[in-house]
Amino acid sequence: MLHTALIGVGGFGYCHLLALEKLIHQQKLTLSAVCDVNSHFRPEWEEKGVAFFTDYRELLRSVPHLDYITISTPIPTHSEIATACLAHGIPVLLEKPPAILPEEFAKLTAAQAASGKICAVNYTMTADPAFLSLMQLLKNKELGEIHTITGTGLYKRYQSYYSGSPWLGKLNYNGYPLRDGTINNPLSHLLNNMLLLADAAGGRPISVEAELYRIYPISGEDTSCLRVLTANGIQLLFYATLGSHEQTPAKIEISGSNGSAVWQYPGYLQTAAGVKSYPPEENPTDQVHENMYQFLVNGVPLFCPLSSCQNTVLVSDAAFTSAREIKTIPDSFVNSYSVNGDYARELIGITELVQAAAAKQALFSEMNCPWAVSGEKINLRRFLC
């Protein structure tokens, strides 16, 4: 039986708790300790007989043996806490994104190498069985030479979403370049999967063009589009918004010289051979924790090791450099309304715009869109070796 701990039990930490409880029920794990800066959680955990800490450093000093530790804390703390856990010789399951800046990611990678322990990242869409099947198709070159990988994520968020944590929607937070938004938070899963598919097809990103926008009264972005080119000629097109009329599943379409494929989350894959559908998990984080357990016990490959996230961090960083700034879309292009005491904003025509842009392999600024502004093409070669 493995011994584990969780840093960050509030917010998304609850999903990790559910996953851990499932493994505990299966007698695969025991939860030795939890940590959260909010001390009001203490009585609940002490009643359960689980050690509770408000400082992760105290947890690391006080708990002698842990087989792995899960970090589900605000984005600005991810790399710092993960580095400390690795320095204590503890394997880490880290909430996404692992880092915002390439130099921050490089330090975390160095810390992992020095520790000799693994750091896995909770990009839950990498655990989707339909996505894993698609990855294998590309590795086997069953679609031939890949030409385009197009990802769309039309999500809907309300104003209350940004009240969930003080850092949500922030471009910077307490001096940290947080860059919260579609690229680094809700739709980062989609971007990460696209780049993993490109990598499976031998594609290393060499340039990025990006456009970043906002319709909500935030400092970060809530709408984006990117064009990424790889050294072997693959073009990736990423379209995302949190201002859709209704939320639709994240989707990736792939075009190759020998066929095409469509993946939709969760559990849908369409190829020339037909459609495969997999039953969705009630809590996708379950699969990630089961994978972590199987890696530690049986050596099963991780869905998303830290090393596989490098391109995502590089592309995300380049996107903000390319866009130069986040452009506020004028209210004349936005619908605003109240819903059950909450407040919603929708970008008028965003679904049709994304569909048309994807069909033309174009960015918003290339579609005669009145509010769109083009970005600079950023060369990534200097980051790659």
PLM region spans:
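Glycine- and charged-residue-rich phosphate/anionic-cofactor binding loop of Rossmann-like
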Residues: L29-S32, N298-N311
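Short, Asp-centered acidic motifs that coordinate Mg2+ and/or phosphate
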Residues: A33, D67-Y68, T148
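Contiguous beta-strand/loop segments that form the cofactor/metal-binding neighborhood of enzyme cores
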Residues: R179, N185-L302, S316-F320, S332-C385
